[in-house]
Amino acid sequence: MYGIEYTTTLTFLILLILLNYILKSITRIMDYILYRFLLFVVIVTPFVNSQNYGINLPITGSMDTNYQNVSNPEPFLTSTLCLYYPVEAETEIADSSWKDTLSQLFLTKGWPTGSVYLKSYTDIATFSINPQLYCDYNIVLMKYNANSELDMSELADLILNEWLCNPMDITLYYYQQTDEANKWISMGDSCTIKVCPLNTQTLGIGCLTTDTTTFEEVATAEKLAITDVVDGVNYKINVTTTTCTIRNCKKLGPRENVAVIQVGGSNILDITADPTTAPQTERMMRINWKKWWQVFYTVVDYVNQIIQAMSKRSRSLDSAAFYYRI
């Protein structure tokens, strides 16, 4: 009986010693692998151009924060940039290969060939009918013209912000604007907008609901019209529906992947609808050059600084759908 107990105890001790040996062997092997791996990392690290990620990056709800822990000096290599310009620039430059030249200049700033798209538009009024902004970053050049200053301001308000829009049936319903973010946006070849404010008995205030000639005209033959009326009041609306489409829109916030560069003019256009607030100049910039080559040279020279004031977004603007948050 004692012999069996001694044998069991001896077997247990042998297994314990064997297990201890195995564990020590595994530990030595792991230490060997770990030390070799760390040595490899130390040797290779100076030769690797990697992007470092901080542990405590702030989550702010905005992508505008400039993170200083990016070791790659060219953060825009995987992005696309659209540059919109009036067609008069092509006429003045009169060089069939000018886009290739500009592409090579963008390459010196870290934008590979094929990542920058140059798109022309006829004029502000035409561009207002159907602005389409599809790139990760979009820069719109607008040449200042005193005669089209208000058109430029409305177009800037449209493309620098995101809008959520619904159709309006003005033949059946009255409409009212609920707050400052609520606007009526009209687009078309010719938009003439007339409104008649109503009292609580749905009678016209200073106008007759049955006679559109007594309505108050707020836009005349415009291609783009952003209408702002007194909030909380019902309105009967008259629009030239054969040449214009009107939508009830809500401004959701800034469209941060779009910037507008005003070419010329003494001051940057103010697109703020509320007269009690400071002028809205965020992502609104100005270049004072007479020649278009000078304008493009300046854009190339400062393109990365301009991009830093923007945020890369995947959503695009296609007003053909008249639904601005896509």
Swiss-Prot record:
Domain of life: Viruses
Pfam family for this entry, one: VP7
Signal peptide: 1-50
Glycan attachment positions: N69
Subcellular locations according to the entry: Virion; Host endoplasmic reticulum lumen
Alphabetized GO MF terms: metal ion binding
Positions contributing to Ca(2+) 1 binding: D95, G206, T214, E216
Keywords of this entry: Calcium, Capsid protein, Disulfide bond, Glycoprotein, Host endoplasmic reticulum, Host-virus interaction, Metal-binding, Outer capsid protein, Signal, T=13 icosahedral capsid protein, Virion
Keyword Manganese listed: no
HAMAP family membership: Rota_VP7 (MF_04130), Rota_VP7_A (MF_04131)
Protein task: Calcium-binding protein that interacts with rotavirus cell receptors once the initial attachment by VP4 has been achieved. Rotavirus attachment and entry into the host cell probably involves multiple sequential contacts between the outer capsid proteins VP4 and VP7, and the cell receptors. Following entry into the host cell, low intracellular or intravesicular Ca(2+) concentration probably causes the calcium-stabilized VP7 trimers to dissociate from the virion. This step is probably necessary for the membrane-disrupting entry step and the release of VP4, which is locked onto the virion by VP7.
Note: Some rotavirus strains are neuraminidase-sensitive and require sialic acid to attach to the cell surface. Some rotavirus strains are integrin-dependent. Some rotavirus strains depend on ganglioside for their entry into the host cell. Hsp70 also seems to be involved in the entry of some strains. In group A rotaviruses, VP7 defines the G serotype.
Family from the record: Belongs to the rotavirus VP7 family.
Protein name: Outer capsid glycoprotein VP7
